[in-house]
Structures are given as C-alpha cells and as structure tokens.
Amino acid sequence: MKNKMFAIAMLATFAAPALADGIPVEPGLWSITTTVNMPMMPAPQTMTVEECMTDEILDMEDMSDDDLDPNCDYALDQLDGNTMAWSIDCPVEGGGQMHAEWTATSNGDSVEGEGKMTMSMQGQTMNMDMSWVGERIGACD
C-alpha cells in the first residue's frame, strides 16, 4: 500500500506538469515526504524517500501520450506562476469511477502539494487525502 501511495505522490508531484509547461522543478536529488489519510487506515501513513530527478524525468516535452493512461481524462485547472492545479478522471475496473484533484506549488528547490481522490465502485466510495513536501537536497550521485 505504501508503494502505491508513493507512486501516486510521484505522479502528482512530477509527472502531472505534462499537462502544461508545468511549474519550476530543478533536477537533482530530492527528499519527498508524503502523508496519506484514508478512512480504512487506522492512522495517516507517512513515508519519506529520496529520488534522483534527472533532466530527462523532468523534461515534460519528452513525455508522450503513451506515458498517460488513455482511458483517463486529464485537465489543467490552473497554472499561475509557481502553482498549478489539475484533475484526473478515470474509469475503475469493474465499472467504477475515480476522480482526483491536485495542487502543487514549487519554487524550483522545494515543492508542496495536496490532493483528494475519490473512487466509487459497486456502491462503495473510498476517499483519500494526500499531502507532500519535498526539497532538493543536492546533486544526484
């Protein structure tokens, strides 16, 4: 579960700028702390990782439609200086729907954001709140 939440955080933080020119994020070694809160978890789950974000990873012009789920709709809701907001709507296997709204603010060497995801399937609804903070801590090895 933690790895899935980290993957969602990484997508939300770094891949989502593919929706537009994005916000400033400097390449290098990043420390990212993600906190996920879901009603079915006894307490919020927090995870900190270090990730090397290279020019290639951050170059959104190199990202193709193949990198995005073709079944999902992606919308850039706001891009204003160093802040962006976007949403994603995807069908869920078994006939459900997932909707997520994300915001992120970056000054190049730090980033913070939050998101809310709602998944509806077979009459059940699951909500997830997530926040993250990250900072560039140096060059990649």
Residue ranges of each PLM-predicted region?
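Sec/Tat signal peptide C-region and signal peptidase I cleavage site
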Residues: 14-20
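Cleavable N-terminal signal peptides
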Residues: 7-8, 18
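Subset-of-secretome marker
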Residues: 21-141
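Bacterial N-terminal signal peptides that target proteins for export
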Residues: 1-7
